[in-house]
Regions:
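Secondary-structure-rich domain cores
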Residues: 213-220
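A conserved hydrophobic secondary-structure block that centers on an alpha-helix together
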Residues: 223-232
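Extended non-globular scaffold/tether segments
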Residues: 200-211
Length: 788
């Protein structure tokens, strides 16, 4: 089935809509806090604010819509969250005027900010408090580009829904909360009062989302009275019935299941601007019972289900990521908000998770060709090749979706972190490549960590050469190091020092969110927040992980390899000579630079010399971070991914001993340095598989193929076997760009002719013409493979 006329119109309207900054949420929230509900606890205050938002925000049902609800007043209207980050007038002007990832800011919106929102929130936002609480050491490292902080402009909440909302309605949650409240023991439980307030807040939040859906039901009823077309009148009456049923009660059919999720998604992302966006998780397995039931009863056919899913897809595409500025915009410069749908994998009993709904969803992904939602295939040894082949046919269209994950390895990763086997099998990937136990875990991404920058500071005895400031430890003049072991030991000391600073900061930030910014609606959706009477931000979830995302693994590997190979092994140059060359960005030393680029072992070529150093960096990073306790009762873990932060981190890192020029991008994910992999994709997979992916919470590997390679069935089968091979080698994730360099260069020169060109950036797809020039050039520079 292709798109119906309804879907074509809705899809085009979504694509044509302009990303606009909406002041609606900020105005309503400010009005609520002006009123101040009296002496109530922080969780209850946040729940009352949530209720106020849902009672007063504008609602609308667009022409032809079957799935209803928007975060803002209209599609592509992005709300703001001044309690977290209050944008200045300068921020608004920048958002309105910048060339890429801009948001239209109307004069009326700017005036509201100037007269109402900024005067109330300036100095009071959590971002203001966060920066006030950070140490001088943290500030220096942050400003130098050692790390970023995810929670300075967006809330934690990187989590995924399980199947509970498909079996239970909000009234069931409220009944459970009432039971927990009645059972509180104030005589013997010293935390009873805190639990009471959190449970009361969850109850208010659950009631609020029911009221919100009823507003939509009433809107549909009113529209039905006015519309002349009998078919649309019937649809609106059905929408009213759906919205009266869910999410108050459990969904009874396929349509209600989709609408139930969408109301929950809106609730989570209206409450706070969770990073990454809330995700549906294993949508195929959640929808399969409703699909089969509809077919058996004769109330649903495949075409109807497909149209509903297509309408569902459009709702995701209508929601741009919240406006970002500063470092946060640099580390994640995209409209995409990373809501990922998992397909396939294995069920909780360990059996094959592929169903007829899996293939239906793959058809929808190919037909819709939208950036959001993101999609992934979860590949298990138990899945049929037909499943991967179907996904491969989509990949070869050059859409960048779906990405591929090793479902069997993800289970190992989660079990290693302490999850039960059942919870691990119900987990998967979200955001870019991060893993968690769906519906049961708060796995917070804390920010990116610049591995090559730490080495750069090591090579300057703790000084940042960009600013001239001493921000690290004095680990010794590297010209005096007699061996690679001395150099690596100095790097490990700096690495531990900066990770200590990063973790200390995040311990404080976690408490700030737990204390001042509870999330009662998100909390009631995640086990075991109700049972514990604790907020999602305060360790209420069954599992609570904190991730730090390492960036530039390929770059730091090649840098250390060059130092070891040329200075300590071959002795073809001295450390002093190397430092002199990078200090002047290789000006006057192009011959030596070409030697570093072309006559040095490189990661990504199945070369044990370079790959062995990669393993040492991996082990150093893992040992310095993994297993540290966070404040929520969980532990810190590593993962390796960049979003767009390898561009930002490169812009603050000078020339490096691998031949890289100053201020240019670092390598992305666990991919080799751009252009350094010269022995084909199989060699890349061999190199990447030499790290222990099972000890991470996610690794990201990009590959770029020519369209000609995948043009026939033999090419498709080669891609299927490449994915299978990498996962046999225990790789975590792989994704593909299928586009040639010539097309990308033409798109740079004539963007108006290539507005629909989509590429895979990091853990997401984006329009090539929406990317910064630096990011466009980085994607062009990635090695293009014409053979397997």
């Amino acid at each position: 089935m292709s798109m119906t006329e309804r879907v074509r119109k809705l899809r085009q309207a979504s694509l044509d809509a302009e990303e606009t900054l909406s002041s609606e949420r900020a105005e309503l929230l400010t009005a609520f806090y002006w009123q101040e509900p009296g002496p109530v606890s922080a969780p209850v205050r946040r729940a009352l604010a949530f209720r106020y938002l849902l009672e007063h925000k504008a609602i609308s049902i667009g022409e032809g819509e079957l799935i209803v609800g928007e975060k803002g007043p209209a599609p592509k209207n992005a709300p703001t969250y001044p309690e977290l980050c209050c944008h200045s007038l300068e921020d608004l002007d920048l958002l309105n005027s910048r060339e890429k990832i801009s948001f239209k800011v109307s004069p009326e919106t700017r005036q509201v900010y100037e007269q109402t929102i900024i005067p109330f929130w300036q100095g009071k936002s959590l971002r203001d408090l966060l920066f006030r609480e950070m140490t001088d050491e943290w500030q220096a490292a942050y400003e130098a580009g050692i790390f970023t902080e995810f929670m300075e402009q967006r809330a934690p909440g990187h989590t995924v829904l399980d199947d509970k909302i498909y079996h239970r309605g909000m009234l069931d949650f409220i009944a459970e909360i009432e039971t927990r409240l009645e059972a509180l023991d104030f005589l013997h439980d010293l935390g009873a009062y805190s639990k009471q307030e959190e449970l009361r807040a969850m109850r208010i939040a659950a009631e609020a989302i029911v009221g919100f859906s009823e507003r939509y039901a009433e809107e549909a009823r009113q529209q039905a009275k006015k519309v002349a077309d009998p078919k649309r009148r019937s649809e609106l009456k059905q929408i009213a019935e759906v919205c009266s049923q869910v999410p108050a009660h459990a969904p009874r059919n396929f349509w209600e299941a989709l609408q139930a999720y969408w109301f929950v998604h809106l609730g989570v992302t209206i409450e706070l601007n969770t990073w990454d966006s809330f995700c549906p998780g294993h949508l195929d397995r959640h929808l399969t019972p409703f699909y089969r039931q509809g077919l058996e009863e004769g109330t649903l056919n495949r075409e109807q289900a497909e149209e509903l899913l297509q309408c569902f897809w459009i709702k995701f595409n209508n929601q741009p990521a919240p406006p970002k500025v500063g470092v946060t915009a640099a580390e994640s410069g995209t409209y995409t908000d990373f809501a990922q749908i998992n397909l396939g994998g294995i069920l909780e009993d360990g059996s094959d998770g592929v169903s007829e709904v899996t293939y239906l969803l793959l058809d929808v992904i190919e037909e819709m060709r939208l950036l959001q939602p993101s999609s992934s295939i979860q590949v298990s040894k138990k899945n049929p090749d037909r499943f991967i082949q179907r996904a491969a046919r989509i990949i070869r269209t050059g859409f960048g979706q779906p990405s591929a994950f090793n479902a069997d390895l993800i289970v190992q990763e989660l079990v290693r972190m302490g999850k039960t086997m059942e919870d691990a099998r119900s987990g998967g990937s979200s955001g870019c490549v991060e893993v968690g136990a769906f519906g049961k875990e708060a796995y917070i991404l804390t920010g990116y960590f610049n591995l090559p920058k730490v080495l750069e500071i090591t090579l300057h005895n703790g000084r940042d050469p960009r600013s001239g400031k001493q921000i690290g430890l004095e680990t010794g003049d590297p010209t005096g190091f007699q061996s690679f072991e001395e150099l690596f030991a100095a790097f490990e000391k700096q690495l531990l020092y900066f990770l200590d600073i990063k973790v200390r900061g995040n311990q404080v930030i976690e408490r700030l969110y737990a204390t001042f910014m509870p999330a009662p609606f998100l909390s009631l959706l995640i086990n075991d927040c109700i049972a514990r009477g604790r907020d999602y931000h305060d360790g209420g979830a069954r599992y609570n992980s904190s991730y730090v995302q390492g960036v530039g693994l390929g770059s730091i590997t090649d840098i250390l390899t060059a130092l070891n190979y040329h200075i300590y092994d071959r002795k073809s140059m001295t450390m002093a000579q190397m430092l002199s060359m990078i200090e002047v960005d290789f000006v006057g030393f192009e011959r030596e630079r070409q030697k570093l680029l072309n006559k040095t072992p490189k990661y990504g070529n199945d070369d044990d010399y370079a790959d062995g150093i990669m393993r040492r960096v991996f082990e150093a990073y893992f040992n310095a971070l993994d297993g540290r306790k966070n404040t929520r009762g969980g532990e810190y873990r590593i993962n390796l991914l960049p979003t767009t932060c390898h561009i930002y981190f490169g812009s603050v890192t000078g020339a490096t001993p691998d031949g890289r020029k100053a201020w240019t991008p670092l390598s992305e994910g666990i991919s080799p340095v751009q252009g350094a992999d010269r022995h084909g994709p199989t060699a890349v997979l061999q190199s990447a598989s030499k790290m222990d992916h099972a000890r991470t919470g996610g690794t990201l590997l990009n590959q770029k193929f020519t369209p000609q390679l995948l043009a026939d069935d033999a090419g498709l089968e080669g891609l299927v076997q490449l994915i299978r091979t990498y996962f046999i080698l225990d790789g975590h994730h792989i994704q593909f760009n299928v586009v040639d360099v010539a097309t990308l260069r033409l798109a740079q020169k004539h963007p108006e002719e290539y507005r629909d060109l989509i590429v895979r950036v990091a853990g997401y797809s984006d329009y090539f013409c929406d990317l910064s020039e630096a990011l466009q050039n980085e994607i062009i520079a990635r090695t293009e493979h014409g053979t397997f």
